[in-house]
Amino acid sequence: MPGNTFGHVFRVTTWGESHGPAVGCTVDGCPAGLPLDVADIQRELDRRRVGQSRVSSQRREADEVQILSGVFEGRTTGTPITMLVYNTDAKSHHYENIKDRYRPGHADYTWDAKYGFRDWRGGGRSSARETIGRVAAGAVARRLLATFGITLVGYTLQLADLRAEVFDEAEIERNIMRCPDARVAALMVERVDQARRELDSLGGIVEVRARGVPPGLGEPVFDKLQADIGKAMFSIPAIKGVEIGEGFGVAMLRGSQNNDPFIRRDDGTIGTVSNHHGGILGGISTGEEIVVRLAAKPPASIAQPQQTVDRDGNPVTIEVHGRHDPTVLPRLVPVAEAMLALVLADHLLRQRLARVTWEDRSDD
């Protein structure tokens, strides 16, 4: 089964299933000498962990990461970094009575259509639990980016029709919705509680920003920076739409409105007055803030009766019980940050291979 590896230079392979013994990843291509501690990875995994609030799945997992290779005495060795998280609270019996019934909105049918055989326990490889490996790898990428002054911040921008109206970065980790608007965050929690009582779920939008990205990252023509960002984000379970900068809003603008005038800043660097382009032009970073938005569908696992068919095509009714997220948004935030970090780390290393300057050459 191909498709488990992401990146060109900074390469990440994830592995494992939702109800298997463990999940994890291997990072290859990380330079040697990068300071890295298990706490760096655990911090990000804790943000993604299930059961952390009433707006997430009540599955109880510690998600304690183990670094098996690639790190010695607190620094990366330049060899593959393998990280592992054991699954300790899988309850496969919740799926016994529906294993031959196709859950609406899930990948059950499509995986059967492709492989003719699938792990039906909790969605197997198609489960969002696979994203543990992404978040662990993203934590390594973030440490690398930090050495170049690049930082990322993600947050819940919108839940259903409730949209943040204020951006207070300090507020993001203070509320369980990870929303930068405290007032709207409280309304979001109430809406999620209502959906849970009604045995339903809610979608929304997560936004991620990257700051300090130097100009010049991106590989024309088919590996444009926004193309790789789009692939990264669309590979996350539940994502149905991705925007960069003004996104679909550009359809309503004139060129005179959408163009961002260039200026020379006081420090001598080139920048733009506005940022409709979201930090990318021609597939290459401009040095402005990179702004990405992801539209997430409502989680497909709901306990309402739904019409479907079984593997033989017979009409049946299904109710999906178990421990499921009423919305993915708060736990999606660290996953989206991780995927953007992986793209930027990969392109940062690729850029260092793109050209040789006279300053890079040593005297003979």
Swiss-Prot record:
Its cofactor is FMNH2. One of its GO terms (cellular component) is cytosol. Keywords: Amino-acid biosynthesis, Aromatic amino acid biosynthesis, FAD, Flavoprotein, FMN, Lyase, NADP. Pfam families: Chorismate_synt (PF01264). NADP(+) binds at R48, R54. Disulfide bonds: none annotated. It is an enzyme of class 4 (lyase). It comes from the Bacteria. FMN binds at R125, S126, S127, G282, K297, P298, P299, A300, S301, R323. GO terms for molecular function: chorismate synthase activity; FMN binding. CDD domains: Chorismate_synthase (cd07304). Pathway: Metabolic intermediate biosynthesis; chorismate biosynthesis; chorismate from D-erythrose 4-phosphate and phosphoenolpyruvate: step 7/7. Reduced FMN (FMNH(2)). It catalyses: 5-O-(1-carboxyvinyl)-3-phosphoshikimate = chorismate + phosphate. Its EC number is 4.2.3.5. GO terms for biological process: amino acid biosynthetic process; aromatic amino acid family biosynthetic process; chorismate biosynthetic process. Belongs to the chorismate synthase family. This is Chorismate synthase.
